[in-house]
């Protein structure tokens, strides 16, 4: 039983080796003699179990041994290609810093410059700062109005108007302070006069009270004297 199993395994190995040789050629150092060596070792191992053995069928090696190297010689290895970065930077998650400088890709549409708006902040101001030109709020009017129709004297007129506004505010503050001081002095003078009159009036009332009280005291003394009974007259002889 063991001998039959061994013979079946040997035949299976030979058949597989033949199929591999016919399909892919004798490559990678594959040789049928290796299988024969293995079967001989197996035979020596199992000799003490049975005496009947079957002679293995030998397969003929290919006539031209150089054919197995033809396949290796004809194979060419290609260099792996490098992946290029996308030419459009917008493909990287759709994030690009240049979008901040473009009014056309805003969600609410491109902003139109308004006629009455002046001194606003626009994308052109950002471009001027990035390019090193500096921020010029007096030259560039709001809404990105940086065309050729800008007035070069608008900055001077704006500065003049600002200075005039500050000067008028200071003048009004000074006038208000002077008028407040004058009204305070007038009120203080009026209160001082009123206090003097009140003091004189109080003094006069005190004098009248003193004058009126003196005769009253004299009269009361006289009344007390007349109210006493006359002394008794001595008897006449």
From Swiss-Prot:
Topology, Cytoplasmic side: 183-237
Keywords: Cell adhesion, Cell junction, Cell membrane, Glycoprotein, Membrane, Proteoglycan, Secreted, Signal, Transmembrane, Transmembrane helix
Family the entry assigns: Belongs to the CD99 family.
The protein's name in its UniProt record: CD99 antigen-like protein 2
Tissue specificity annotation: Highly expressed in the nervous system, including brain, dentate nucleus of hippocampus, granular and Purkinje cells of cerebellum, brain stem nucleus and choroid plexus. Expressed in peripheral blood T- and B-cells and neutrophils (at protein level). Almost undetectable in bone marrow-derived neutrophils (at protein level). Also expressed in thymocytes (at protein level) with higher expression in cortical thymocytes than in medullary thymocytes. Expressed at high levels in testis (mostly in germ cells and Sertoli cells) and ovary (mostly in granulosa cells).
Domain of life: Eukaryota
GO terms under cellular component: adherens junction; cell surface; extracellular region; plasma membrane
Membrane topology: Single-pass type I membrane protein
PTM notes: O-glycosylated.
Region span, Disordered: 47-157, 218-237
Polar residues: compositionally biased ranges: 218-227
Signal peptide span: 1-25
Compositionally biased residues, Low complexity: 51-66, 74-84
Subcellular location: Cell membrane; Cell junction; Secreted
Extracellular-side segments: 26-161
Role this protein plays: Plays a role in a late step of leukocyte extravasation helping cells to overcome the endothelial basement membrane. Acts at the same site as, but independently of, PECAM1. Homophilic adhesion molecule, but these interactions may not be required for cell aggregation.
Glycosylation sites: 154
Annotated organism of origin: Mus musculus (Mouse)
Record's compositionally biased regions (Basic and acidic residues): 102-111
Record-linked InterPro entries: CD99L2
Record field: transmembrane: 162-182
An individual GO BP term: positive regulation of neutrophil extravasation
Residue spans of biased composition, Pro residues class: 228-237
């Amino acid at each position: 039983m063991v001998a039959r199993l061994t013979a079946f395994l040997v035949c299976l190995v030979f058949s597989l080796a033949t199929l591999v040789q016919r399909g892919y050629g004798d490559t990678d150092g594959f040789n049928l003699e290796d299988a024969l060596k293995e079967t001989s070792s197996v035979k020596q191992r199992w000799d003490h179990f049975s005496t009947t053995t079957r002679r293995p069928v030998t397969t003929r090696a290919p006539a031209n041994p150089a054919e197995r190297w033809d396949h290796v010689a004809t194979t060419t290895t290609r260099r792996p290609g490098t992946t290029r970065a996308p030419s459009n930077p917008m493909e990287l998650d759709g994030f690009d810093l240049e979008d901040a400088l473009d009014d056309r890709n805003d969600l609410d549409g491109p902003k139109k410059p308004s006629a009455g708006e002046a001194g606003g902040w626009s994308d052109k101001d950002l471009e001027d700062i990035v390019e090193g030109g500096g921020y010029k709020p007096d030259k560039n009017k709001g809404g990105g109005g940086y065309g050729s129709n800008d007035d070069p004297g608008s900055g001077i007129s704006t500065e003049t108007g600002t200075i005039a506004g500050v000067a008028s505010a200071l003048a009004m503050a000074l006038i208000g302070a002077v008028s407040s001081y004058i009204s305070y002095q007038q009120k203080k003078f009026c209160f001082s006069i009123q206090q003097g009159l009140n003091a004189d009036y109080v003094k006069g009332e005190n004098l009248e009270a003193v004058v009126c009280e003196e005769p009253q005291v004299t009269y009361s003394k006289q009344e007390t004297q007349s109210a006493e009974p006359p002394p008794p007259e001595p008897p006449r002889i």
